[in-house]
Amino acid sequence: MSMWIYFQGLDPSVLPGDPAGFEALFDVEFDELRRRVRAGEAVWLETGFFQLDEIYWSRGDGELPVFGGRQVPDPAGGPGHVAVDPPDVVRAAAYLERVSFPDLWEDWRQRQTPAPDEDLCDRLVRYHENLRTFYARSAERGWAVAKYFSF
């Protein structure tokens, strides 16, 4: 089973407010999603994003979780969507700029049994850098972020 999460930066005036609006935003050809990622308007994460969320939460300092936001439930029972308003995008960008991923990884890795492999570390480093760049760009533009989950 394929699992992924897609983050889309957008002007807050067009941030969907209901499940149908989110479905319309993300109901595009895969090539369009890839174009958005290449243009820096979006980020796509696959295997490992659950672990990355745990790593960010391990700080325990009450920062906005990068994967958090306002839940928009799916009436059909799917994973739903998440909306992040511009002030929280700024907070997430500041958090990602401030944290040391190697330190977070080491703290998290020491609590795992069995120890995670280096392939996972390499993937999560790339995800962290992609998210850091994406949230910084979105914050600079005053954007909101819409998230689409697929499980």
Residue ranges of predicted features:
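Secondary-structure boundary elements
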Residues: 136-144
